[in-house]
């Protein structure tokens, strides 16, 4: 298991008022209770963000646990906490993340997508699923920053998800933290198989992604299913990997990744988390 952290939130003075973008692997729902090394690293980073960016006014987060036809954004003013899973310890169902929603920010998201030629709608009833609230419990544990969740469109490819994030880049200069919640590896069959030793393919796939992200090799990343080692074993389905492209799109050209975690949990779940700054 390897875990390293770089907690710099900004390395470029020109971006002093531009919030970073966060990609976070949310792992199992148990990440809310079993934080490992990744949870504290996210909490420390979140504290630094709040100190350095007092203008923080909201979060826009994509989760693969909200998949819909088309493009949607949550406009629920009080989304609440949805325990959208089964078979876990009772303590997990007692957790709440009571962050308010932000309908006005949802409208800003819709406007930016419209300007980019992306048709989208709002959902005023949507609650926060665990792909959103579990990582946010670590990043912003006070639950006092309004949250707007973005759906992952069914059948979207990497380029389309990238475009969704790219259209929202300007929000970073307007006090908005953009978060993409997914998983660097997500093979549930192996996860439920109870492996404890870190599988070699998990490390090889994760480090390949890191190399491409750091080099800005977007075309190679778009072609990940053919280019990455062990791609289909790391992701038998692609929904937990695609939020990465939302982060990369929102990060934009020249963004550098500052890794917060390279931890592997349960032998198969790479908990990679990094902030993009430019």
Residue ranges and their predicted role:
Residues 2-116, 120:
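A short aromatic-anchored loop/beta-hairpin motif
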Residues 13-15, 51-52, 139-143, 170:
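Solvent-exposed alpha-helices and their adjacent loops that cap or buttress functional pockets
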Residues 20-24, 58-63, 150, 171-184, ...:
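Beta-strand elements within well-structured catalytic alpha/beta cores of enzymes
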Residues 22-23, 84-89, 140-148, 222:
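Short, basic/glycine-rich phosphate-binding loops at helix/coil junctions
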Residues 25-28, 151-154, 225:
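Short, histidine-centered active-site or binding-site loop motifs used for metal coordination
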Residues 106-160:
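Internal, conserved structured core segments that host functional sites
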Residues 108-111, 115, 145-146, 156, ...:
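Surface-exposed, charge/polar-rich loops and edge strands
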């Amino acid at each position: 298991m390897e875990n390293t952290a770089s907690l710099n939130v900004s390395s470029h003075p020109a971006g002093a008022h531009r919030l970073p973008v966060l990609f976070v692997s949310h792992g199992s729902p148990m990440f809310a209770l079993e934080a490992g090394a990744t949870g504290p690293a996210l909490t420390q980073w979140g504290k630094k963000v709040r100190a350095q960016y007092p203008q923080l006014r909201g979060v826009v987060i994509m989760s693969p646990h909200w998949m819909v036809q088309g493009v949607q954004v949550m406009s629920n003013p009080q989304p609440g906490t949805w325990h959208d899973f089964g078979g876990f310890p009772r303590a997990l169902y007692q957790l709440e993340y009571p962050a308010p929603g932000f309908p006005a920010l949802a409208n800003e998201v819709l406007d930016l997508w419209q300007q980019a030629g992306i048709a989208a709608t709002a959902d005023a009833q949507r609650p926060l699923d665990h792909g959103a609230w579990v990582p946010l419990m670590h990043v912003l544990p006070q639950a006092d920053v309004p949250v707007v969740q973005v759906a992952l469109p069914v059948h979207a490819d990497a380029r389309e998800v990238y475009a969704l994030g790219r259209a929202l880049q300007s929000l970073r200069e307007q006090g908005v933290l953009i978060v993409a919640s997914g998983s660097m590896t997500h093979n549930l069959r192996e996860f439920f198989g109870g492996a404890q030793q870190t599988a070699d393919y998990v490390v090889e796939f994760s480090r390949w992604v890191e190399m491409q992200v750091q080099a800005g090799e977007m075309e190679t990343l778009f072609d990940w299913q053919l280019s990455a080692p062990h791609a289909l074993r790391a992701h038998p389905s692609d929904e937990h990997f695609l939020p990465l492209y939302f982060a990369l799109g929102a990060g934009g050209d020249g963004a550098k990744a500052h890794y917060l975690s390279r931890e592997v949990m349960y032998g198969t779940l790479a908990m990679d988390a990094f902030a993009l700054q430019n």
